[in-house]
A protein has these predicted regions:
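Pyridoxal 5′-phosphate
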Residues: 1-380
Length: 380
């Protein structure tokens, strides 16, 4: 049975053009990028060209881009790195209640080190409360960390406004942009972003590679000791094929963003239209207007979310009930609870995240099966 993939917020299929770009560095140009001989110099050149591509697309300097193993490492490095570097200035961090576990768990670890963390509320759409954010700022606040777009409900946060608040109060601003990069054109200068996390596999690039943008002049502590790679900020031999792949993937994403987003949004809206018309007792979660183009999070009354997923899987349909990083948890989504969804209804959610390879025929197949599954579950 062919799989029909609707979980692009969890990961995306590697683009064939990206794979083609990576192949020479897996087969012929396999030299260590830190080596001085020609094979190593070829690898170094490829790494720096990819760094330049990413920097140009984010409107920053190549020296402000640091390669990591992915979004979680980038988030950990950003938050712990700033906290430990500026502890003498203060010990207070502000974040939101709907962040990815890579941010929330990092903040919880810092609380064990006597850092203080304020968790800002969001409204029913998942949008951060800017007035509460302002009211939580203290003389000891050193960092604000708010995600660019939510991985479960797709809500896009008012990043420019948050960046302005942070700048006016001389506080560093980090955004987990893992879901946004590749879907939204981001200018770190215009948005007053000091630190930004991204991950290659969210925009049709390879897994196991990410990056951290850190504005010049912002200091952060390193957490992997050893060699002097990444300007002595992250030890370890560079993953050259993955770095090359991520640079190519982001370049492709930017060049075709409007076209793909328009198509993906059209499919998402068609899916929701059919669901609203053909299945009763549903609730669409998140900001209907201001969200990622492929995201749809719907709760189905009297139909267990895990049961829906298992039944969809039996029909070859891949979907999710929320963050892939919390799968296996019996607890309802912290994001849905934060936006006021009742606990039972939060357990009955289905996240569909569409991508550039999805088709209208696949959406029809999804809804046709979903109708039958919900009907069966409600009759039990």
């Amino acid at each position: 049975m062919k799989n029909i993939y609707f979980d692009n917020a969890a990961t995306t299929k590697l683009d064939e053009e990206v794979l083609k770009e990576m192949m020479p560095y897996l087969k012929e140009n396999y030299g260590n990028a830190s080596s001085v001989y020609s094979l190593g110099r070829e690898s170094r050149k490829a790494v720096e060209e990819s760094r330049e591509k990413i920097a140009k697309l984010l409107n920053c300097k190549p020296t402000e881009i640091y390669f990591t193993a992915g979004g979680s490492e980038s988030d950990n490095t950003a938050i712990k790195g700033i906290a430990h570097s500026y502890r003498e200035k203060g010990n207070h961090i502000i974040t939101s209640k709907i962040e990815h576990p890579a941010v929330l768990e990092t903040c919880k670890e810092l609380e064990k080190e006597e850092f203080e963390v304020s968790y800002i509320s969001v409204d029913k759409n998942g949008t951060i409360d800017l007035e509460e954010l302002k009211s939580e700022i203290r003389p000891t606040t050193i960092l604000i960390s708010v995600m660019f777009a939510n991985n479960e409900i797709g809500t896009i946060e008012p990043i420019k406004e948050i960046g302005k608040i942070a700048k006016e109060n001389e506080i560093y601003f980090h955004t987990d942009a893992v879901q946004a990069v590749g879907n939204i054109k981001i200018d770190v200068q215009e948005l007053n972003i000091d630190i930004l996390s991204l991950s290659g596999h969210k925009f049709y690039g390879p897994k196991g590679i990410g990056a951290l943008y850190v504005k010049s002049g912002v200091h952060f502590k390193k957490y992997i000791d050893g060699g002097h790679q990444e300007r002595n900020k992250r030890a370890g031999t560079e993953n050259v094929p993955a770095i090359v792949g991520m640079g190519k993937a982001l370049e492709l994403a930017y060049h075709s963003m409007e076209e793909h987003n328009s198509k993906i949004k059209e499919l998402r809206d068609y899916y929701e239209k059919r669901v609203k018309e053909e299945i009763d007792n549903i609730k669409i979660n998140g900001n209907i207007e201001n969200r990622l183009p492929g995201n749809s999070n719907i709760s189905f009354k009297n139909a267990d979310g895990e049961g829906i997923l298992l039944n969809l899987d039996m029909q070859g349909i891949c979907a999710s009930s929320g963050s892939a990083c919390t799968s296996g948890s019996l607890n309802p989504s912290h994001v849905l609870l934060a936006i006021g969804v009742e606990q039972e209804l939060a357990k009955n959610s289905l996240r569909i995240s569409m991508g550039k390879y999805n088709t209208k025929e696949e959406v029809d197949y999804l809804v046709d099966n979903l109708k039958q599954i919900i009907d069966r579950m409600r009759k039990v």
